[in-house]
């Protein structure tokens, strides 16, 4: 898998520490992915690992720092150097599980946006059984206008078709009701634009309960709503699976049932765990950037790198750009009045 693909990996920021990050790098390298890891050589302990090169740096950007000023000031920070490595052509994609804001800023400044894209959006594949569902924006843009939501819809549809293999994906707009007039002003306006937009299969509004049901192949929201919704789903999944486990241990009869259910519950828990997806993709840039979930372990780090490599392998950026052009998402009304 992924022979010939090189990924620049931020060696700082993973909440589980250098050991988990290094083990994740080893796992990804075992799949044939080449890695250039930016971090402290001694702590990472990756010297001599085939396919892994450590580029020493001791500077990094923490979650408490203001992302944009920090990225501009800390030219040698690990995430900034990872983005620069891709921009310079030394790597094909970048991955960071550090500060989300710093990763987005470094990637946007370093990798640049696709022509006509007003704002990049963070997209994540939801663990919906039986079909891939792409959800965006999950945190890049807290405040948006209607035109941004429309462009997110085109970005998501293009990526879903190009990378997830969904032919003509149906796109839904997250709102408080299915009716076209429900929701905030920008959501209502976006609904009207999407209903008339050429080249997109618009499913209308979807409610929060429709997210795990897979009513649409792509679901679009502003970054605030998307981030809260995603974390609510993750927290609910942990609570429910934990409650089932505790109930199964409550008495001998339930314990027998729990043993019978263990394979199914184990599979469900793995499917819902952040380690499985690894991270979110920053759509709308000229190269691949994956923002890893900060709490993931080695498997999550490896899967974030694998996701980045997969996107490179299938030509996700070029295919997404082509589909955007075909749909007119970077021209005309969709770009007009969108602002910065």
Task: List the predicted regions and their residue ranges.
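Short, glycine-rich nucleotide/cofactor-binding loops
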Residues: 7-18, 71, 140-150, 291-298
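Short glycine-rich anion-binding loops that position phosphate/pyrophosphate groups of nucleotides
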Residues: 12, 59-60, 99-102, 109, ...
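Glycine-rich phosphate/diphosphate-binding loop of Rossmann-like nucleotide-binding domains
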Residues: 19, 32, 36-42, 142-208, ...
């Amino acid at each position: 898998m992924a022979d010939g693909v090189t990924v620049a990996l931020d060696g700082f920021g993973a909440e589980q520490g250098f050991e988990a990050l290094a083990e994740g790098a080893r796992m990804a390298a075992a799949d044939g992915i080449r890695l250039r890891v930016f971090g402290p050589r001694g702590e990472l302990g990756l010297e001599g690992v085939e396919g892994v090169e450590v580029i020493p740096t001791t500077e990094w950007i923490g979650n408490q720092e203001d992302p944009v000023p920090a990225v501009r000031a800390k030219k040698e920070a690990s995430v900034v150097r990872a983005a620069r490595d891709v921009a310079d052509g030394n790597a094909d994609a970048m991955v960071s599980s550090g500060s989300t804001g710093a990763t987005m800023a470094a990637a946007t400044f370093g990798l640049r946006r696709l022509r006509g894209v007003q704002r990049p959006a963070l997209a994540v594949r939801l663990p919906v059984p039986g079909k891939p569902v792409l959800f965006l924006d999950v945190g890049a843009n807290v405040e948006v206008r209607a035109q941004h939501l429309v462009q997110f819809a085109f970005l998501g549809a293009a990526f879903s078709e190009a990378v997830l293999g969904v032919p003509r994906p149906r796109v839904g707009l997250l709102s408080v009701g299915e009716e076209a007039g429900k929701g905030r002003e920008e959501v209502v306006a976006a609904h009207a634009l999407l209903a008339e937009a050429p080249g997109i299969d618009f499913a209308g509004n979807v409610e929060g309960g429709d997210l795990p049901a897979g009513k649409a192949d792509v679901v679009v929201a502003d970054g605030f709503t998307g981030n809260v919704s995603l974390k609510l789903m993750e927290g609910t999944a942990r609570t429910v699976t934990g409650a089932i486990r505790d109930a199964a241990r409550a008495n001998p009869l339930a314990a027998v049932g729990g043993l019978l259910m263990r394979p199914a519950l184990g599979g469900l828990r793995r499917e819902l765990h952040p380690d499985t997806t690894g991270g979110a993709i920053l759509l709308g840039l000229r190269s691949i950037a994956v923002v890893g979930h900060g709490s993931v372990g080695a498997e999550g780090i490896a899967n974030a790198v694998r996701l980045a490599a997969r996107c490179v392998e299938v030509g996700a950026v070029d295919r997404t750009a082509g589909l955007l052009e075909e749909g007119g998402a970077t021209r005309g009304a969709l770009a007009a009045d969108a602002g910065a």
